[in-house]
Structure formats: C-alpha cells, structure tokens
Amino acid sequence: MCDNSVKHTSENGDGMEKEELLQRVFGYSSFRPGQEKLIDGVLSGQDVFGIMPTGGGKSMCYQLPALMLPGITLVISPLISLMRDQVMALKVAGVPAAFLNSTLTGPQMQAAYRNLLAGRYKIVYVAPERLDYPGFGGVVEKLNISFIAVDEAHCISQWGQDFRPSYLRIVQFIDSLPKRPVVGAFTATATRSVQEDVERILELRSPVREVTGFDRPNLYFEVIQPESKDKTLLRLLAGQKRKSGIIYCATRKKVESVCELLCDHGYAATRYHAGLSEAERSKNQEDFLYDRKTVMVATNAFGMGIDKSNVSFVIHYNMPKSIEAYYQEAGRAGRDGAEADCILLFNSGDVQTARFLINNGSDNEEMDAVQREEVRRQDLERLDAMIGYCKTKSCLRGYILDYFGQKHPVMCGNCGSCKGNFQSVDITREAQIILSCVKRVHDALGYNVGANLLGNILRGSRNKRVQELGLDKISTYGLLKDRTRSDTHAMLDHLEAEGYLRTEQEHQSVFLTPAAGEVLYRGKTVTMLVEQTHEPETPVTETAKLTADDAQLFDALKELRLELAKKAEIPAFVVFSNATLADMAKKKPATMSEFKKVSGVGEIKAAWYGTAFLKCIQSYLDENA
C-alpha cells in the first residue's frame, strides 16, 4: 500500500501532499463527502468505484490523484463539452492537460500526440471511440499510464439509459496495455443493477466503493398538471428574469415555440437542439454559460458535461423518458449548493410523445438490431417508472431515491407532495362512468381508443372524430361535462394507477382490467387524493394567540412532534408546522374527521400522524378535566 503522503511531482510544484494540492491547485480547503476515500484508494493502487450525485465532485477524485501519481492519467468520457471545459479549467489552474476527440483537426491531433509522447501532459481526456484508432494505440503503448478513469460509467451497461457499445471496448483496451493501471469508474446515475454491470464488465478488482447517495437536499421537486403549460410556465418564471435556468422540451419544434414565447415576454432566452448548426449551438451555449442569456430552452441534447453552477431552476416542459434522464437533467440546478427548483409540467400527451420517441428512436447507430430492440424494451420499462413519478401523490424525492435503491425518510419536506394539502375524495360515481365508457366504446366500435378520445366523449365534446365515429350517441357521452379536461385525465390516470385500466403501449388504447368489474358490478368504492389549492379562509399564523390552557397543549404537541421526527429521522417542521400545532391546540379535534380540518393537515399526514396526535390531545384533556 502506498502511503497517502505520496508527493506531487507534476509541473505544478514539488513535494505537495493531497491536502495542499486541494487548496493550492483547486482552491478548496476540505474534501467533499466520499472524495478522500476514493482518492486514497487510487493512491494506494486500488481500483475505485464512485457513485456521486451531479455536482458532488466526481472529477476531483481523478484529477487530484493524477497530479500525485507518476506518468499519465487517462480520462475516458463521452462528453465533448465536459472535456473542453475541464481541460480549460485545469490549464487555468496550471495543470498540464489535453483532450483528444473529433473536434481536433489532423494537425492538432498530431501535435497533441507529440506533446503526449514528450511527457507534457498529466491528464488526457479521450472519447471511448478513440481507443480503437490505430494511431492512438501506437502512441499509448509508449506511455506510462498509471490511472484510467472511466467517467459516465453507466454507459457501459445495457441496463443504463445511455448505453454506448463503444464503452464495451474499454476492457480490451486496458488488457492491451503493457501494464494494467489502476482503474476507476464514476457515475451520477446508476441503479443497483447498473452498478453491478459496471463493476463486472469493467472487471474492477475488489474496488474501493463509495456511494455518497443520490439525494440533493437543496433541490425542490414538484409535478404540475396544468390546463395550459404556456400560462403555467410564465407564472413560474414571473419575477425570475435575472435568474439562470434551463427549460427542457421533448422536441425541436417545442423548443422553438417556447423560446419564442419567452422572448416575446421579455426574457433573455436562447435555444439549443440538434437541428441548429454547430456554430449556432456553440454560440447559444456560450451565451448561457457566460450569463449573456439567462434562460436556455433545449432538448436533451443540451447539458451533458455542462458545468454551470448557478442554475436556479430546471423546468421540464415535457416529461422525460426515464427517471435517470430526469434526475440527470434536473440535477443541473443548484450545483452551487443554493436552493433551486425542479418543476415538471405533465399531461397525458407527454406519454404519447415519449412512447413515440422510444418506438421510433434510432439515435444510437453503434447498436445492431437485437441491441436496439432490447434497449427499446428497457426504455419502455423506464418510461413506466417515469409516468409513476408524474402521477404519485407520495414524496417525490422519496420516489426518486427509492428508484435508485437509497433509503430515505417517509417525507422530505421539500417537494410538491410533502408541501401540498391533499384531501381524499370519493370518485366512485365518476369511476363507474369512465369504466362504463371504455366498455361502451368497445361495444360500439369493436376496438378500444385512447385517453384523449375517451376524455372528449366523457366531457361531451363536439370533436369531429367523436361525431364521425358516432360516439356522441353512446349513453356515457357528456356525463362528465361539468369536469375540466385536467380533472378527467387525472381520474383516468388514477384508475390506471389503481389497476382498473391499462394502456396498451403500441397504440395507447385504454382497456378495462379484470379488477374493473369490482367497481362496475359490485360497487367497490374508489377514492382519490386531490390537492386543495385554495387558501384557507382564515390563515393561521405561528403567532396566533393561545389561551394558557391551549399553550400547554401546544407544548405537549411540540414534544410529540419532536419525538416522531427523531424516530423518522426528519426535521420537526416536516411533521407539522408550528402554525398547524397552534390550530390543533385551539380546535382540539377528537376524531379523524375533525383532525383533517386542522389547517395544514392533509390526507397523507393525517394517515401517518393522526392517531398519535389525537391520543395526545385526548390524554391532555383527560388530565385537565
């Protein structure tokens, strides 16, 4: 084992240890969580595997040891933007670094090879495709490579959302070297199965593993199902013209229309998608990075490897195709540690768009037909998980962390679900109407139709297709005419989530499941959590005046809150705010129905905490009778 006082021998100085390098070269006084463990592993000659959230400091785990090890560190990355930005930052810090990728001209590449052979670089970034180039192989065999860092390591797994067959060649490349170097794998988004794949395929040897967790506590998550996405977007951006943010759209056409909308309303917005020329993309990206433009409207082609720390919000105008993609894109907010918002605008049309893009996508030409079909199948599975996120009423942060296999508190206190006020509503009648409509449409046509057409039928729309198919004549036509489009689709989504409906993927047609019979024929009750968006008639403040007796009960309720919070390992305010406890002390509810009328008590919190607080109130009343 090498000791951790291995000296720094690069051109930056002599004899520096890691703490001194961290401060003097990179400007940090201390390591972030997990960094030192991985760095020590590399310096001791062990393979390492780091799973850290976006903005968690992965690059330090290979940049710093590169300066302390003899020879060269090779960083394999698919991100051209990241290569350029990190090499630029390293050079500014005085670290000799270079990148080798397709953006270099022939003469530039030859000059880089000469400098490499002359020992003028400590860190070299390469794209995985470069490993197969004959010219590169001839240069590499003459080098002393002490460390290979594989960035975005999830790309090696077919279970990963960004599978790249070129990553599978990395092991062959390592095996071809005269001496096997230390190997490190780094990623921000990897489920348990992807982590296992990475370790197995890269043939990591008893690696030092560090999973710092996927949680980004400074990010606020919310899903909104608006009537008008444009109006909602403008409302969200009101008063934020000086803040930097990214708005992701699913298609180039939508990027253009949203960017135009924002510019028309006085926002300094620019755009980014694959349909623009490389020169325009580069200019627009620089305008955003250097704050000449504050809002970037883009497809998912934007952002990989972009290291802009002051992004205050990421809004998804459309639903992404996977949790991995969403968390990676949303994670570009708040990289400076400041509070930031991650908002997703969702409607049923997003599901259709995502399925179309998956079923018709051919953006990875490295794959053969069999690989593409397998990836398509996995992408559809990931899409189902993403749809679940958009429809859940449980903690959004918890949903994401569950997906990545990380334990978490029941409530985070910093997402739309935890801060929302939900009430359970009986929708049995509406459910029977919807399920009956699905059946009657099939009886009339001999086939099933999609959610949009069902919604039009139920709301009594004079839609041309409804009339052409004669669906304005069936008995369920117009029975939900008093409901908004959003309400109707929310109920359709809920019935699917509860297992009464299923959507066939190929044509997005909606079918009844066997469970639907329980509601249609046996009167099973169906309830649905609905967010109460109105303001309470009489807002209760924390400073509300309490009688002496009420103040005593208030103190008892605070003690119970603290006890529950400690058990759940969450902040006390996440259980209930002081304002809610004050209202509770004044109203002294005796039943669950009364408890739900306390300001700040929603259906979910009532289910979790109601019994304990009701017992506390009753005990207090008994003792003071």
PLM regions and their residue ranges:
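Helix-turn-helix/winged-helix DNA-binding modules
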Residues: 30, 178, 306, 392, ...
